[in-house]
Amino acid sequence: MCVYEKIDNPEKLKQYAVKAKPAVEKFSGKFLVRGGKNRTNDGIESPRTVIVQFPDYNTAIECYDSAEYQEAHDILKGHVVRHHQIVEGS
């Protein structure tokens, strides 16, 4: 799950998305929420939220730690403020 607090460079976000999508799909990740209309009820105002479902917790960690995903992640450095969490489902 990724909650964006600030996006300074939308073009870099697009470049990141192009690279991140195949990395996520390689680990059988399924995008459940990817941007779209949202309403903040409590906490920080967020222009974008992304939720990806993986087969299990460890696969999500493997994806995040993979060279492919980290290459995509590097594109965002200095261009966004976001809160990224890997949460085990029930």
Q: What annotation goes with each model-predicted range?
A:
Residues 60-85:
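C-terminal structural segments of small proteins and small subunits
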Residues 1-48, 53-65, 88-90:
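Short S/T/G/P-rich N-terminal loop/turn motif that feeds into the first structured element of a domain
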